[in-house]
Amino acid sequence: MHKLLKLPFLALFTALIMLLPAGCGGNAASSNKAPSVSAESSTAANPSPTTAENQSEPTEQVELLVSAAASLTESLDELKTVFEAKHSNVKLIFNYAASGTLQQQIEQGAPADLFLSAGTKQMDALVDKDLINHNLRTNLLTNELVLVVPTDGSVKVLDMEDLTNLGDIAIGTPESVPAGKYAQQTLTSHQLWEPLQPHLVLTKDVKQVLSYVETGNVDAGFVYATDAAQSDKVKVALIAEPESHDPIEYPMGVLKSTVHPVEAKALYEFLLSEQAKQVFSQYGFTPAE
């Protein structure tokens, strides 16, 4: 009886022995697959530099506000295109007016990043009030004062004394327009300021003087040589002697209150570059020494 029981037991034992390799093999396979799943999880949790770190932030768009003398309009409008092409994130916005008007606006808190004046008086006033960055202030350009008359008119002026034979003569308001101040100094040096008072027409800026002469509203007017060069409706009758008035200098300065100091300095340096000087020269300005 005991012998009959041994056979089934041996058969069962043998079957169990044969099943062991299969079980171990299954565990090995599971173990081998685990790292593959873990690697995929690691990739998802830690994205590659290409998908995260290399994504650049969008460049901030900046608007620079430039208060500039009206006589700089044409040259700065051309340079605006050049500068913005080099600095795609910067947009230049110009406020053109008489230098004295711009000075008052800035003193009263009007926003501005740069100031370009047609006279040192206006710039010096802002420097004295500590509104200009002393390290970013320089004389940029020089100009000439001329007397213009209509191209197709019959007005003839050979010297300053001939002005007493004319009708109305336009000049910028001396208190706020540098060209008007230079005209006043020139007329005073020739003892003509008082005699011509009944004939003087005061304007808000030098561009208005030019317009009055172009349209024949006045017989003559004092403007900058650069303004006269931009119009075919006027011609230069006289050039004021340099010694008859203060030097005509165009200072430039960065405001201390600018909220974009990096971009403002970039524009400041660009306007001093050889490329900018060539453009200014094309409009009749002379780069300051």
What are these regions (language model features)?
Residues 1-12:
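Bacterial N-terminal signal peptides that target proteins for export
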Residues 19-23:
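C-terminal motif of bacterial Sec signal peptides marking the signal peptidase cleavage site
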Residues 24-81, 100, 104-107, 119-120, ...:
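Exported/periplasmic ABC-transporter solute-binding proteins
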Residues 64, 90-92, 145:
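Conserved beta-strand core positions
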Residues 81-94:
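Signal peptide-proximal N-terminal region
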Residues 89, 111-112, 218:
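Short, high-confidence coil segments that cap the C-terminus of an alpha-helix
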Residues 113-117:
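Periplasmic-binding protein-like
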Residues 126, 130, 134-138:
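Central helical "cap/lid" subdomain
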